[in-house]
Structures are given as C-alpha cells and as structure tokens.
Design a protein with these regions (language model features):
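Short strand-turn-strand beta-turns centered on an Asx-Gly dipeptide
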Residues: 62, 219-220
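Conserved NTP-binding/hydrolysis module of P-loop NTPases
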Residues: 168-170
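Bacterial N-terminal signal peptides
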Residues: 12-21
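Conserved, helical-rich catalytic subdomain that frames metal- and/or nucleotide-binding sites
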Residues: 172-175, 179
Length: 241
C-alpha cells in the first residue's frame, strides 16, 4: 500500500543526501581551483576529504602527504589534528593507513635474500650499511631461524652510505658481502654494476615514509621501525602467520 508519509521521508532523505553530495563536490572543486590558482607549483592533489572538524578539509598530495584547509582554501594548516577526548592523533592514524605496505606490494626484485633454516617465514628489512642500530639488529637476527630475510639496501645517511650500498649490491655474493661487513667489519670491496635498484629503494622508502633504519615489514603487513631483538621478532612472526 502506498504510504504518503513514508514516501515523503524517503524523498527528503534522498534530497538531503543529494544536497550534501553537491556541497561536498563544490568544496572539492573550490579547494582544487583556489590552490592551483594561488600556488601554481602546488603538487597535484590526490584527494580532498572531510575531517571531523566542521569546515576543515584534508588535502592529500604526493600519495601520503596531508595538509588541511577551509572550504575555499583561504587558510592552510600544516600539522596534526588531535582528538582530545579519545586521545588520538588523527593525522598520525591517517598517515599510518596511507603508508601501510602490503608484503605483496614490496619490490622484492630490488632486494637480496638471506635464508636461514627452511626459510618459510618472511621478513623484509630496510637498512643502511652505516647504521649502528642496523649492525646491532643483524647480530640479533643470527638467533632467528627458519626465515627468509629480504634485504633492501636503503642508504639515507649520506654519500658514503650510497657508495657502500652500490658496492654491496654489485657484489658477486650480496648476502655474504653484507654479513661480512655488518657482522665482521670486513671492508666492502669496490664493484660496479647497474645500481638502479638501490635508487629505487630510496624512492620507495620516501613514498611510504620509511624515515629510519632498520625498518621491518612482516608478511601480514606489520611494520616495525627500530632494532628490535630476536625475541620480539619471533613474537611478531608467530602472530603474522
């Protein structure tokens, strides 16, 4: 049976949604237009979305970078939004989601492997050869068995790090050269080859905000910055199955 009251409610709901969508699209268009006009060199905008604060919008650029603006882009805010009730850094939470790395998305062709035991468990590691914490981490990892380590050379500590990483990548036995240097302080032998993989690692890390070494990525996507010990690695490996 036709119900005028219910039909009217549905019509109002649809109309309200339509008006909201139009307003949202108008805000999106206004922000994009004004930022482009006022900042000709402004990066291409990936997405404009609402924030929990009325009238404030998130503008995402370069894949993972976030700024905030009002609906007309008259004011721009760089920094974090904090939810004081929940005690949560909303910007940090959002950035974590944007920079999450699925293991399947890792460019494994740009890594070399160190296999221990049956190699069934998987860990990706981004390390700089001049990183003291990385050397400590490598020593600890000798206690972790039955795992394959995908080693990404990630020289972010200066020109010498780049030179060493390039030489390590060009070594005949990358895994041996790496462990000789990191564990036994054996000098890296100069070598030459196509080192584009090392440069790609740096670009990949910048994109996903890998800001320090070592950084670990487990098979389930868990990302851990810092030189955690073998016990902590084993615990994460057990839960990442």
């Amino acid at each position: 049976m036709f119900n005028l009251k219910n039909s009217a409610k549905r019509l109002l709901a649809i109309s309200a949604f339509g008006m909201f969508s139009v307003v949202a699209l108008a805000d999106d268009a206004s922000i994009r237009k004004n930022l482009k006009e006022r900042f000709p060199n402004f990066p291409a905008i990936d997405e404009v979305s609402k924030t929990p604060i009325p009238g404030i919008f998130e503008v995402r650029v370069n894949g993972t970078e976030i700024i905030y603006t009002d609906a007309d882009a008259n004011h721009m805010i760089q920094g974090s939004i904090l939810d004081t009730k929940a005690r949560v850094n909303l910007t940090e939470e959002r950035t974590t989601k944007l920079t999450a790395i699925a293991f399947s998305a890792l460019p494994l062709k740009d890594a070399f492997t160190i296999v221990r035991g049956n190699g069934k468990r998987k860990i990706a590691v981004f390390e700089d050869p001049n990183c003291g914490y990385c050397k400590r981490f490598e020593a600890n990892m000798q206690k972790v068995d039955n795992a394959t380590f995908y080693m990404f050379l990630y020289p972010i500590l200066g020109a010498d790090s780049v030179a060493k990483s390039n030489n390590l990548w060009c070594a005949k036995d990358k895994a041996k050269a790496w462990q000789d240097y990191m564990l036994r302080d054996v000098a890296v032998t100069p070598a030459s080859c196509d080192t584009a993989a090392v440069a790609r690692n740096v670009e990949f890390g910048k994109k996903y905000k890998i800001n320090g070494t070592p950084t670990l990525i487990f098979a389930d996507g868990t990302r851990v910055p810092g030189a955690i010990d073998a016990g902590q690695v084993e615990k994460i490996l057990a839960s990442a199955k």
